[in-house]
Amino acid sequence: MKFIILQIKLLLFFLICFSFIVKAEEPKKITNDHEFNFYSGTFDFSDDGKRSTIIGFQHQNESLVRDSFLGVLSPVTGAMITADNATYMYTGVQAQYDLGKVKFTPSFTPGIYNEGDGKDLGHLVEFKSELQLSFDLFENSQLGMSYNHISNASLGEKNPGANSYMFNFLKQF
């Protein structure tokens, strides 16, 4: 038990220190109001029976970016569809950590899921947690990879969840 408490304290310490480092950076001037993320990959890659191709689109409004002790936060909205016609529409929050040419963007987005002919995730309401790493290609373009987990947080009688990975192309307009 003491070991778990120590781990939690260390995690909180590093999160707070990291947020001050990010906060200390000079804020970048926003020249483009919108960032679009086009992605494709494999939905539920860890389940051989329900694995499927996925494509999606996400929008981030750069004019709504806010600094916080957790870093730079912004709202995101998007949708995805699998080859089995499962769909997920979501909106939530994304943190942005600028590490030079590399961007790290974790996000949390509640949404509405329809299984179509795909995997039954157990509930209409699902929650997506995602980690994304992207690299600057050009001034307004990035290429990245992301991993996410979609789960209903035990709202339904069953909660199988789905793990997915995607390749991302991000463009600011």
Each language-model region and where it sits:
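Outer-membrane beta-barrel "beta-signal"
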Residues: 51-57, 135, 160-173
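Mid-chain, well-packed structural core segment of small domains
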Residues: 103-129
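Short loop/turn motifs that connect adjacent beta-strands in outer-membrane beta-barrel proteins
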Residues: 24-33, 47, 63-73, 98-104, ...
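Cleavable N-terminal export/targeting peptides
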Residues: 1-31
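Solvent-exposed loop/turn segments connecting transmembrane beta-strands
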Residues: 43-53, 79-90, 117-124, 154-162
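Helix-adjacent hinge/juxtasegments
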Residues: 84-108
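Residue-level signature of outer-membrane beta-barrel architecture
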Residues: 59-61, 95-97, 135, 149, ...
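Transmembrane beta-strand segments that form the barrel wall of outer-membrane beta-barrel proteins
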Residues: 35-44, 70-82, 105-114, 146-151
